């Protein structure tokens, strides 16, 4: 029998976007071909898809690291890079996805249900897409964004109409095998059932599913015994059935005390339910009681004795013997009636309306705050500035100048000045820290001296070609003047 795994922690990493291309069109008789660098391809995303043929999370137990392919780099001649293919990961029906903080992200129920667990990164723009009046042939391109990386917890919660709950060795597995074609492991020792067993039951022309889950002991809601491994698998059941062993020889146990103990555990577990439980709390689900093993004479007498007392709670009571196959048909049709009545009483599920929240006009999309780790420094946070920094190649001066222009147009520099930032102070955006120089890019017109360079970022102490030429002209002028003076002196 394959190993059953119903809870795993995985690491999902989506593909990164491809880098844009910085190239210039070269063709005979076309000296000004212009930029033709293509955009990078989008990175592949990781998508969970419910597959009815998958029944366990075992594959994730042995392969917890999942990564999607990255996008390809853009190329010249306006050729965009290929997008990375989305990675579709098959998960069982009833899988719950939680983030690293335990917050519910998705409840995957129903064949074909999809959920994007990690989004692929955007591809970087090529220099053809970055061309403008100021930059007719940009000597740079934007880098692709890294794909989303997440640590996720997957939990499997059995999807069944009826959940059988009871103490160990109460006969739950025997009952499932008697009313369905399921063949769970059956033995005469406690905790024989370690994994949920599902069976399909026919009630005339109708069918429903029954789940036999691991046995319950007092304190299961706090983790004793199989604890949450038991209780997790009954959250989705529409009807809960207490299977009571009327032939038990354990001292201090009787059908009434067993039912009270089971109900106490259900009540204690209900506040821990995560997310939206469409069927309501466990304490509100319909109940039925199966008094099992009445083929034993003493057990039959005990079942008859407590039957009326249990029925006073408003729960149907069924006397059953799986060995003699007695009372099975009334139980099957009684459960189907409870399921149909409960489901018909549930309100119709209305699809959630899409809520659009417009961004205010005066929302700049960033925030500047003092850096608590370093006096006099500042931290700029916001989706756009941080994305722009990730897309910038800091080995290219022209790309850095383009980033400075974008930040200035967004209003970052103006906000830094308002907060009292001084030239040379450290400014952190995302993972990068800069020495802020307001006179470098602030509102100055773009002056390009060559592809991949920005005159505003050149060091002022470096002597340029024009300065060297002027110095040589001055030296020649000085030499000529000195030579003329000497000649006049000799003639005199």
Swiss-Prot record:
Obg domain spans which residues?
Answer: 2-159
* PANTHER family attached to this UniProt entry: DEVELOPMENTALLY REGULATED GTP-BINDING PROTEIN-RELATED, MITOCHONDRIAL RIBOSOME-ASSOCIATED GTPASE 2
Q: Where is Mg(2+) annotated to bind?
A: 173, 193
Q: Which cofactors, by name?
A: Mg(2+)
**Name of the protein described by the UniProt record:** GTPase Obg
Q: Name one Pfam family in it.
A: GTP1_OBG
Instruction: Give the GO cellular component terms, alphabetically.
Output: cytoplasm
**Organism the protein comes from:** Mycobacterium avium (strain 104)
A biological process (GO) annotation for this entry? ribosome biogenesis
Q: How does it assemble?
A: Monomer.
Entry's family note: Belongs to the TRAFAC class OBG-HflX-like GTPase superfamily. OBG GTPase family.
Q: Name one GO molecular function term.
A: magnesium ion binding
Role, per record:
An essential GTPase which binds GTP, GDP and possibly (p)ppGpp with moderate affinity, with high nucleotide exchange rates and a fairly low GTP hydrolysis rate. Plays a role in control of the cell cycle, stress response, ribosome biogenesis and in those bacteria that undergo differentiation, in morphogenesis control.
The enzyme class is hydrolase
Extent of Basic and acidic residues compositional bias: 453-469, 476-492
Q: Which UniProt keywords apply?
A: Cytoplasm, GTP-binding, Hydrolase, Magnesium, Metal-binding, Nucleotide-binding
Residue span, OBG-type G domain: 160-340
Write out the ranges of the annotated region (Disordered). Answer: 449-492
Cellular localization per UniProt:
Cytoplasm
List the EC numbers from the record: 3.6.5.-
Residue ranges of coiled coil: none
Which of this chain's residues are annotated to bind GTP?
A: 166-173, 191-195, 212-215, 292-295, 321-323
Residue ranges occupied by any OCT domain in the UniProt entry = 358-438
């Amino acid at each position: 029998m394959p190993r059953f795994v119903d809870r795993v922690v995985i690491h999902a990493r989506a593909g990164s976007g491809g880098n844009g291309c910085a190239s210039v069109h070269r063709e005979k008789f076309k000296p000004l071909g212009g930029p033709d660098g293509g955009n990078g391809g989008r990175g592949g995303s990781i998508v969970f898809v419910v597959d009815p043929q998958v029944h366990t999370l075992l594959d994730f137990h042995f392969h917890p690291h999942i990564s999607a392919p990255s996008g390809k780099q853009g190329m010249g001649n306006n050729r965009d890079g290929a997008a990375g293919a989305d990675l579709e990961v098959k998960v069982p029906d009833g899988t719950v996805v939680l983030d690293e903080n335990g917050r519910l992200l998705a409840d995957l129920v129903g064949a074909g249900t999809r959920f994007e667990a990690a989004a692929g990164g955007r591809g970087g723009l090529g220099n053809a897409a970055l061309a403008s009046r100021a930059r007719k042939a940009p000597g740079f391109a934007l880098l692709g964004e890294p794909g989303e990386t997440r640590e996720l917890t997957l939990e499997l919660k059995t999807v069944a109409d009826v959940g059988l709950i009871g103490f160990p060795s109460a006969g739950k597995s025997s009952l499932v095998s008697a009313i369905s074609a399921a063949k769970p492991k059956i033995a005469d020792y406690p905790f024989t059932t370690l994994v949920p067993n599902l069976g399909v039951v026919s009630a005339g022309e109708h069918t429903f599913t029954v789940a036999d889950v691991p046995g319950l002991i007092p304190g299961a809601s706090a983790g004793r015994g199989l604890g949450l491994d038991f209780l997790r698998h009954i959250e989705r059941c529409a009807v809960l059935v207490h299977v009571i062993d009327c032939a038990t020889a354990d001292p201090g146990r009787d059908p009434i005390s067993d039912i009270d103990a089971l109900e106490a555990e259900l009540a204690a577990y209900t506040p821990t339910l995560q997310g939206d439980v469409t069927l309501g709390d466990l304490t509100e689900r319909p109940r039925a009681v199966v008094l099992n093993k009445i083929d034993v004479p003493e057990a039959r007498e005990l079942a008859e004795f407590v039957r009326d007392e249990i029925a006073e709670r408003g729960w149907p009571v069924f006397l059953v013997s799986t060995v003699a196959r007695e009372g099975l048909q009334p139980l099957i049709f009684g459960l189907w009636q409870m399921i149909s009545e409960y489901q018909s009483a549930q309100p119709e599920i209305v699809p959630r309306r899409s809520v659009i929240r417009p961004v205010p006009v005066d929302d700049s999309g960033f925030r500047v705050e003092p850096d608590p780790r370093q006096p006099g420094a500042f931290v700029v946070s916001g989706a756009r500035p941080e994305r722009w920094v990730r897309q910038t190649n800091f080995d290219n001066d022209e790309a850095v100048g383009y980033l400075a222009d974008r930040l200035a147009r967004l209003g970052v520099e103006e906000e830094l000045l308002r907060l009292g930032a001084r030239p040379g102070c450290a400014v952190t955006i995302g993972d990068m820290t800069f020495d802020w120089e307001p006179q470098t890019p602030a509102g100055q017109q773009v002056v390009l001296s060559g592809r991949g360079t920005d005159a505003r970022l050149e060091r002022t102490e470096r002597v340029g070609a024009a300065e060297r030429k002027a110095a040589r002209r001055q030296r020649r002028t000085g030499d000529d003047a000195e030579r003329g003076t000497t000649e006049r002196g000799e003639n005199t």
